[in-house]
Curated annotation (Swiss-Prot):
NCBIfam families: PRK00129.1 (NF001097), upp (TIGR01091)
Organism name: Clostridium novyi (strain NT)
Catalyses which reaction(s): UMP + diphosphate = 5-phospho-alpha-D-ribose 1-diphosphate + uracil
Documented activity regulation: Allosterically activated by GTP.
Stated name of the protein: Uracil phosphoribosyltransferase
Length: 209
């Protein structure tokens, strides 16, 4: 069964409040999304396996713990998921980055895939799918479907804010995928947008309409 983790760290909630503010411009919005992604990545990677290694300090030899070299991949859902990648790469710079492009049909609210490019060994990697907003859950579900078709077995989903409906939809469709969110909002409105939300994350990241 999926595990849902709300990473309610004071720094994350503070930065999310600024991100939500309609008066926050694209430059600050981009920087804050990157910062929150980096802070969240700290928790998302908490259970990475460690191994004991021997190193030599300027004083003596000693044993320390280091990451065991498990392969990782970050897969942003385009466009908005791109804004979270650089923050995560600061903590896990060896991760490879795949891309899934989706847009939402404004009439059906359903996602349409238009691009997918993955590392050749994606099936061997622990994958973190990124999208700032988990609204209906449709894009995340389809992105995870696309990864599983390519043999992926270890997948986590990381979002800045989510709706209860989106969380339930992903859990029902993919009970093996753990979900990490910065904040859980009230609900979706009749147009499928998160309330109170933060607007269109892609438009606010890139200054488009």
């Amino acid at each position: 069964m999926s595990k849902v983790t709300q990473i309610a760290h004071p720094l994350i909630l503070h930065k999310l409040a600024i991100i939500r503010n309609k008066n926050t411009g694209s430059k600050d919005f981009r920087e804050l999304v990157e910062e929150v992604a980096m802070l969240m990545a700290y928790e998302v990677t908490r259970d990475l396996p460690l191994e004991e290694v021997e190193i030599e300090t300027p004083i003596c030899k000693t044993k320390c713990k280091m990451l065991s070299g498990k392969k990782m991949a970050i897969v942003p859902i385009l466009r908005a998921g791109l804004g979270m990648v650089d923050g995560m790469l600061k903590l896990i710079p060896a991760a490879k980055v795949g891309h899934i492009g989706m847009y939402r049909d404004e009439e059906t609210f359903k996602p349409v895939e238009y691009f997918c490019k993955m590392p050749q060994d994606i099936h061997e990697r622990d994958i973190i799918v990124t999208d700032p907003m988990l609204a209906t859950g449709g894009s995340a579900i389809d992105a995870i479907n696309a990864l599983k078709k390519r043999g992926a077995k270890s997948i986590r989903l990381m979002c800045l804010i989510s709706s209860p409906e989106g969380i339930k939809a992903v859990m029902d469709a993919h009970p093996d995928v753990d979900i990490y969110v910065g904040d859980i909002d009230e609900r979706l409105n009749e147009h499928g947008y998160i309330i109170p939300g933060l607007g269109d994350a892609g438009d606010r990241l890139f200054g488009t309409k």
